[in-house]
């Protein structure tokens, strides 16, 4: 009798362990790796539409608000959030920048995380202009680079790497209208999410807000 009782306890314990394991697996948090195949074809350059899990942000070299050359190597091994803007924009940019400042405050003490904002009007947004803009907005130089550079290269990386603008006619290749998207990039240069840069915490079906972005950044930070 005692033997059967011990056996019953063993099986009950085993079932509890199995149940907990299954529950943990079903509820384990994951964050997708986003590739060109996963994105609306209108937002993907035809040259990269076929790329799957090998897709990463391409090498780049731009100049930041301090006149320093910034390359992909400065972001290697870091989690970062990228967006596209221009300093004289009077529509969505002011709100996007305010929200990036909000995000900067959330991640300023996390050494694993940085920010990267690309000007889509690089000829107008010179180093001097970006420096003034950065001071006005309270940019922390060690955390957030506002970059300018070759217009074609900026537009190319927006279309082929970050997948954030519609591909127009050939003659419109370098006439980009930037979106409100914030792009989350992981330590390996892979896209892990798109977020509405105008929305901090409002729930909108089919899109992620910036509060969710902070949560996803924390998730990636803990995994590293």
Briefly describe each language-model feature range.
Residues 1-57, 224:
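N-terminal targeting signals for export/organelle localization
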Residues 31-40, 48, 145-152, 179-181, ...:
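Periplasmic c-type cytochrome electron-transfer domains
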Residues 55-57, 78-79, 177-179:
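Short, small/polar residue-rich loop motifs at catalytic or cofactor-binding pockets
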Residues 61-62, 184:
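Hydrophobic beta-strand positions
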Residues 70-100, 115-116:
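Short active-site neighborhood of thiol/selenol oxidoreductases, capturing the structured segment around
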Residues 97-157:
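Structural microenvironment flanking redox-active thiols in thiol-disulfide oxidoreductases
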Residues 144, 155, 161-167, 177-183:
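Structural micro-motif
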Residues 170-224:
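Thiol-/selenol-based redox modules, centered on thioredoxin-like
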